[in-house]
């Protein structure tokens, strides 16, 4: 179970220590809507594999693997007298054994959370050492000093193959935090973090997803606590991870981006990254009139407090763009695309309706012409689908061409 460098006598002690801290399962937490409204959504089943390489909120879909390792003792409490014992000027002159013993004493010695030792010092790779206790372990490295591993974070670290896995050696002790009113703790490692919360359990974060997570935190848009490990989409090289405040999705061609709230719910209804929207290509961005939009491989999602969340793509997005997007005369979408007569589709916006047919491009119909169009039963009537945008004519009038004729105003 341990490195080949560990003597067989110490390996037995390690097994004893590990057997004492049972692993329990915790379910993912629900997420609060912020800043856009949310409805519950489910996610396709995908395979969980840690991938060290590697955009407002809903509940984590129950179909996801959200197994957590939480341990007997809640790990969201700071270690008593838990000052940093990294390799500083104050303790660098101490031997590894002395630094480990000092760390153990700071934590209450045999009466603390670690309890009594079950081994002596065991050598590890790169000149590091470990000592086992009834309630956990203490690691020592020349670069980072002595740091304890215990509780739910300890169990999650074990699942990642300890220091020989993608996280490497611990670089800090456990630190208590509260995010969004949820109590938890954080411990850092050479190549990532493990975060534990009272609702989501303990999960590692690393790579590109960790980079995006930390950027969001620095911008005051925290995603909260992780509720799953990083999940790899084996089909196309992407990965994602769910949090109490949303999700982060990564793909080599798009980078890592947050998806939250109403936009996340809409995306979930489109089969997530496997649907026509694909992976997110940008962050949620504030725009006209208090709304937001987010771009995806297949189009753009728009949310506004008075209209809700809708998706615009392909030819409709082209026509919408020609008219100035949400800043133009048509405003925000009021519906998704809807199939219509003869293989065509339409989409309703605040300022008019866009139509598309396989035999033509996408065009808007609005105002007085839209009234005439409605009188003739829209695209299902004798006028059929529009073939042009509205065009100014003499004396301030306008006209618009349709499959079945031309309207004038």
Residue ranges and their predicted role:
Residues 1-28:
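Secretory targeting and sorting signals
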Residues 22-40:
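Signal peptide processing junction and immediate N-terminal pro/mature segment
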Residues 37-63, 67:
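Extracellular mucin-like PTS domains
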Residues 61-409:
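Extended, compositionally biased repeat/scaffold regions that form elongated interaction surfaces
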